[in-house]
UniProtKB/Swiss-Prot annotation:
Control of this protein's activity: Inhibited by apstatin and the metal ion chelator EDTA. Potently inhibited by the converting enzyme inhibitors cilazaprilat; enalaprilat; L155,212; ramiprilat and YS 980. Also inhibited to a lesser extent by indolaprilat; quinaprilat; spiraprilat; captopril and zofenoprilat.
Glycosylation site positions: N34, N48, N64, N277, N290, N294
Primary role: Membrane-bound metalloprotease which catalyzes the removal of a penultimate prolyl residue from the N-termini of peptides, such as Arg-Pro-Pro. May play a role in the metabolism of the vasodilator bradykinin.
Positions bound to Mn(2+): D449
Cell location: Cell membrane
Identification of the protein by name: Xaa-Pro aminopeptidase 2
Pfam families on file: Creatinase_N, Creatinase_N_2, Peptidase_M24, Peptidase_M24_C
């Protein structure tokens, strides 16, 4: 799935407006609000927020606040958040996944990116202003026009990252305003008994067959890293939910699409303290954690809400706490004396988790074989049913989930399926709903970006297809996206190279003709954990590539108002076999679904690219074919064989991307690793 670093392009508003009919100005449409009329016009989808805003402002008065900031995250800086943390959605009525709300004594404003502008106009009432420039700087600029000198801006420190706190604090202080940390969330006070409760599903241990190492081995590894660190920390604080889940091989279902549970861990050189809801652990799980003893390999369970007090108590001694600043909230950071902090971008657990051992690699590969069966079944089913006019984006998304549900060890989807036909596919993160969707047609391209959570691995794959006659431009764009996928996948590069250095290889074929895409090229992926697993990937802030990492490779192209293309595979970083000695790496693709032959212009492929593609198709036949045969899926096996027939060159390629690509891309990026 393409990561949400899509630029805020104004044309996306027009696309959304066109998606289900001819474009109209916002003032003429009945599905969005019009706050310029008297009385204001509100669609039936708009939420009346007057009562909650009045109550919130009363709470602000008790704290002497001029403004209150409401972000869209949780105390663990999670990408996906649970219902009980949907504070920004509840106060605004806007349920999109990205946005920051600010409430002052007289005004309320929401900042969100271009993916959600139309949705916000449909869901918010006229109590709210919509702002389209999303950054701390723009929010602070607005605040300075709305609150007086000396004004106090409140925030929940558990919902701010350390970097977010610092950026707001510096900007407001420079303008003689004050950023005030308030540990009791004011929205929660207003939400009251209507706020969804914290989840209470059982927290369970993964079966040994699905764990790469025992939790005792992992704890010993992290303690060893503590001892080797030059600052000799006495403890590691784990705040990200996947860190604790990975460390103890524990899972649950608190977060949509992610098998996590609300938790923290304080791992010291002599104790293990797990902060969670104690009532959710069965006697078997407690025994698994050795919770009834007091040695250094016994897990002491403490209440989730006690983490801040426990950190304060621990730091009263002669200690040092090692934190990863990217996922530690300011609410914990502010109570740790600075001389007792050891700070890195990512915790040792986050770094260790990113490199899969041989057992974890085998598990992830196995999950991708079964996932390929489900996706191939779906594509074969579409090929037969789309011409009948009976399939739409929403029913298609449900159908692919049904196919995955028949696979062994399936636990659920790994994110909301992106099932997009025609112009909707030009929206990189579009997902259909039961109410709003388009029919799939043989006359249009169709993009499917989907994935599954299995006990042995997490999957994420994107394929774009066309069942009719694609235009020459569609074929060229598709083929250039495919070339980018191939050239990055087959790249050989020095060990410890940053992903951002090689990212241009996925774009070069598009750049050659003036095309590009606005989202990230790839992200890490976990073993029954996050579908977007940091810190692996091709962006700034990602750690250097290392053998054993898994990453997606997903170039794309999006033609405004017409179609979208994305081709995404998951790949394992492996050691490359080179002619001369040296430590070099390359990628081994583990996604196993063929591309659409109808959309490939073979004349654009170099001999090396064509050879790679045919070898990939042979690998699909060898790894997925026997599974289809074993299960008696003969129709799907026939489909697979047809779609993986070797391709042959029809014309000489107009240019070779080999050495030219290497020289130009590295010159652009300065080859700084």
């Amino acid at each position: 799935m393409a990561q949400a670093c899509w630029g805020c392009y104004p044309w996306l508003v027009l696309i959304c407006a066109c998606a289900w009919g001819h474009p109209k100005s916002l003032n003429q449409r009945e599905d969005v609000r019009n706050c310029s009329t008297s009385p204001p016009y509100l669609p039936v989808t708009a939420v009346n927020t007057t009562a909650q805003l009045t109550a919130l402002r009363e709470q602000m008065l008790t704290q002497n606040l001029s403004a209150y900031i409401i972000p869209d995250t949780d105390a663990h800086m999670s990408e996906y958040i649970g219902e009980c943390d949907q504070r920004r959605a509840w106060i605004t009525g806007f349920i999109g996944s990205a946005g920051i709300a600010v409430v002052t004594e007289r005004k309320a404003a929401l900042w969100t990116d271009s993916r959600y502008w139309t949705q916000a106009e449909r869901q918010m009432d006229c109590n709210w202003e919509l702002h389209k420039e999303v950054s701390t700087g723009h929010i602070v600029t607005w605040l300075l026009t709305e609150i007086p000198v000396g004004g106090r801006v409140g925030f929940d420190p558990f919902l701010f990252s350390i970097d977010s706190w610092e950026s707001y604090d510096v900007a407001l202080q420079d303008a003689d305003r004050e950023l005030v940390s308030i540990t009791v969330n004011l929205v929660d006070l207003v939400w009251g008994s209507e706020r969804p409760p914290l989840p209470n599903a059982p927290i369970y241990a993964l079966q040994e067959a699905f764990a790469g190492s025992t939790w005792q081995e992992k704890v010993s590894n992290i303690r060893s890293q503590m001892q080797k660190h030059h600052e000799r920390p006495t403890a590691v604080l784990l705040s990200a939910l996947d860190e604790t889940a990975w460390l103890f091989n524990l899972r649950s279902s608190d977060i949509p699409y992610n098998p996590f549970f609300y938790s923290y861990t304080l791992l010291t050189d002599s104790s293990i303290r797990l902060f969670a809801n104690k009532s959710r652990f069965s006697s078997e799980t407690l025994q698994y954690l050795n919770s009834s003893c007091n040695s250094s390999m016994c897990v002491q369970l403490e209440d989730y809400s006690q983490i801040r007090d426990s950190i304060q108590a621990y730091t009263s001694g002669d200690v040092k706490i090692w934190i990863g600043t990217r996922y530690t909230s300011y609410g914990l950071y502010e109570v740790i004396p600075k001389e007792k902090l050891v700070e890195d971008d990512y915790s040792p657990v986050m770094i260790t988790k990113a490199v899969k051992n041989s057992r974890e690699q085998a598990l992830l590969k196995a999950s991708h074989v079964r996932d390929a069966v489900a996706v191939i079944r779906y594509l074969a089913w579409l090929e037969k049913n789309v011409p009948t006019g009976t399939v739409d984006e929403f029913s298609g998304a449900k159908r692919v989930e049904e196919f995955r549900g028949e696979e062994e060890f399936f636990s659920g989807p790994s994110f909301e399926t992106i099932s997009a036909s025609g112009l909707n596919a030009a929206l990189a993160h579009y997902s259909p709903t039961k109410e709003l969707h388009r029919k799939l047609s043989s006359d249009e391209m169709y993009l499917l970006d989907s994935g599954g959570q299995y006990w042995d691995g997490t999957t994420d794959i994107t394929r774009t297809v066309h069942w009719g006659t694609p235009s020459a431009f569609q074929k060229e764009a598709y083929t250039r996206v495919l070339i980018g996928n191939i050239d990055l996948s087959r790249l050989v590069f020095p060990a410890a190279t940053s992903g951002r250095v090689v990212e241009a290889f996925a774009r070069k074929a598009l750049w050659d003709v003036g095309l590009n895409y606005g989202h990230g090229t790839g992200h890490g992926i976990g073993n029954f954990l996050c579908v977007h697993e940091w810190p692996v990937g091709f962006q700034y802030g990602n750690i250097p590539m290392a053998e054993g990492m898994f990453t997606s490779i997903e170039p794309g192209y999006y033609q405004d108002g017409e179609f979208g293309i994305r081709l995404e595979d998951v790949a394992l970083v492996v050691e490359a076999k080179t002619k001369y000695p040296g430590t070099y790496l390359t990628f081994e693709v583990v996604s196993l679904v063929p591309y659409d032959r109808k959309l490939i212009d073979v004349s654009l492929l170099s001999p090396e690219q064509l050879q790679y593609l045919n070898r990939y198709y042979q690998a699909i036949r060898e790894k997925v074919g026997p599974e289809l045969q074993r299960r008696g899926l003969l129709e799907e096996l026939s489909w697979l064989q047809r779609h993986t027939e070797p391709l042959s060159a029809r014309a000489a390629p107009t240019t070779s991307l080999g050495s030219l690509m290497t020289v130009s891309a590295l010159a652009i990026l300065g080859w700084s690793v």
